[in-house]
């Protein structure tokens, strides 16, 4: 499970909560109640929106009926429905900006202002939020890059480029190198990152919505065995595991390519 800032740990699952059925509650930062009757555990999100990615393991084709049975038991519902109480008044409608890559790239700060209204400030955010507010970025603000002077536009763009370079350097050197693969712990909750914005940016650029190291590991590489950058337009690649040396796992492993 993830909120709009990072992971919510530990998420329900075989490792953390076992295989017994149960009801779990995800609440936002304004939740003041206790644990309702019938709820096994309350997971607290630091933002009003959360995302749940649900995985059900399939051991072989003959296992499909068991998977379908498990999946049929999944149910997402409001707390009022779980408690069989009247539903609260509907939340005000939110006029979201249309999310598309081109729009975000061309109007980044407009999207950042809009996104931050759904990411309430925490003590660990206080310093960086203050810096952003000084140049007009934050909830309810309208940072208009196009209205800046050429000098200020150049300063902002240079700063963004320098920041991006720092993130790339962290991704390249901030983790252990094993046979060309970068191996380390990228993901976690707010306490895991502990205000380390470079680590958070690296985790986001390396791959959003990852699990913490107790749940999964994510070795990654951008180069081949000779150190050359991966380029599918020029080469074909083969990953070879010696006999008996497949990755050791308790659930599954996979190889994913990103463009």
What residue ranges belong to the model's regions?
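A compositional/structural signature for long, glycine/proline-rich flexible linkers
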Residues: 1-259
